[in-house]
Curated annotation (Swiss-Prot):
One of its GO terms (biological process) is translation. It is found in: Cytoplasm. Keywords: Cytoplasm, Ribosome biogenesis. Its main location: cytoplasm. GO terms for cellular component: cytosol. Required for maturation of 30S ribosomal subunits. SUPFAM superfamilies: YhbC-like, C-terminal domain, YhbC-like, N-terminal domain. This is Ribosome maturation factor RimP. The keyword Iron-sulfur does not apply.
């Protein structure tokens, strides 16, 4: 178990000090294959909507330091071992903040609701935007549906050609080395 509210309160000032905005702080199963858990932190540079690898590394160091300091003073933020994962939200990013629903209006999204509306819990269609705390989507099956932000269990963009065109990568430096490393590990 983790105190996500306290973790967010510790992490957000560190992200802001670097000029970044938090997109999500979440505990999830680790991708390390060890059956453990991971503290996933997604952040973005508001100017680009992305983070470079160097920016992720810088935020990771800051977050590690602030969590270590809190735990050394006796706080229990996360029970048990965990991995820290800091990343950019990616192209098919989660939609977690009101501004996400405004910024990505016109793009296809998948939304899972806490409770059914008009017989549907899962929706997929064009995000029409947000008005106050009410999100509207043109669902492929149910038509235009509106619901409160608090009714959303999860939401994310769907990878489409339109979305790819709207989110060009900032920097591909080092990408070939990463691919080569993966190929070498696969050959081992």
């Amino acid at each position: 178990m983790a105190d996500l509210a306290r973790l967010t309160a510790l992490i957000e000032p560190e992200a802001k000090a670097l000029g970044f905005e938090l997109v999500r702080v979440k505990m999830m199963p680790s991708e390390a294959g060890d059956g453990g858990q991971a503290l996933q932190i997604m952040a973005e540079d508001p100017a680009t909507g992305q983070l470079l690898i160097e920016q992720c590394a810088e935020l990771s160091r800051k977050v590690s330091d602030v969590i270590d300091a809190a735990e050394e003073s006796g706080e229990v933020l996360i029970e048990g071992a965990y991995h820290l994962e800091v990343s950019s939200p990616g192209i098919d990013r989660p939609l977690t903040r009101p501004k996400d629903f405004a910024d990505w209006a016109g793009h296809e999204a998948k939304v899972s609701l806490v409770e059914k509306i008009d017989g549907h819990r899962n929706m997929r269609g064009i995000l029409l935007g947000i008005d106050g705390e009410t999100v509207t989507i043109a669902d492929n099956r149910a038509g235009e549906v509106s619901f409160a932000l608090e009714q959303i269990h999860s939401a994310k963009l769907v990878l489409t050609d339109k979305l790819i065109a709207a989110t060009q990568p900032l920097d591909a430096d080092g990408a070939e080395e990463v691919l080569e490393d993966k190929e070498e590990k696969a050959d081992d």
